């Protein structure tokens, strides 16, 4: 992951807490500022039941606004259209469970989850030096 982060000059790296804690620990030892994301954790938006539903919702909006996936990646396409959205009894948007998908004969949407993970939080672009870009002027209201 560190090699890809450097090669593609990633502005952020999000790691699935479910399977990535070991990788995260190694990255931390290497001085990386990666973030663990708990798919079942609290959503950034109260409309969504959990973080997984939130990330998939953000991905859906991105696609609706013109984001695209490689046209020849049928597996990713199938993953994205596989899980259904459900409204729970409290009015939260919830993504269909992987167990329910399996009961319908669908595989776990691993590639879809990986793409959705990129929507876990807003990312501030780094400058060429690797630092976060901030305003280059001081603000003085007086």
Q: Where would I find each of the regions flagged by the language model?
A:
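Mg2+-dependent endonuclease catalytic cores in nucleic-acid-processing enzymes, primarily RNase H-like
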Residues: 1-92, 136-142
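Acidic two-metal-ion nuclease catalytic site recognized across multiple nuclease folds
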Residues: 77, 81-142
């Amino acid at each position: 992951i560190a090699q890809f982060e450097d090669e593609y000059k990633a502005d952020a790296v999000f790691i699935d807490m479910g399977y990535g804690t070991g990788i995260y620990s190694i990255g931390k030892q290497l001085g990386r500022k990666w973030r663990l994301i708990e798919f079942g954790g609290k959503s950034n938006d109260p409309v969504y039941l959990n973080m997984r539903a939130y990330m998939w919702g953000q991905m859906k909006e991105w696609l609706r606004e013109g984001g695209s996936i490689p046209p020849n990646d049928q597996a990713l396409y199938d993953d994205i259209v596989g899980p259904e959205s459900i409204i729970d009894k409290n009015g939260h948007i919830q993504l269909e469970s992987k167990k329910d998908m399996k009961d319908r004969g669908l595989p776990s949407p691993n590639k879809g989850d990986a793409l959705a993970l990129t929507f876990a939080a807003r990312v501030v672009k780094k400058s060429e030096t690797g630092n976060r870009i901030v305003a280059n002027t001081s603000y003085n209201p007086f």
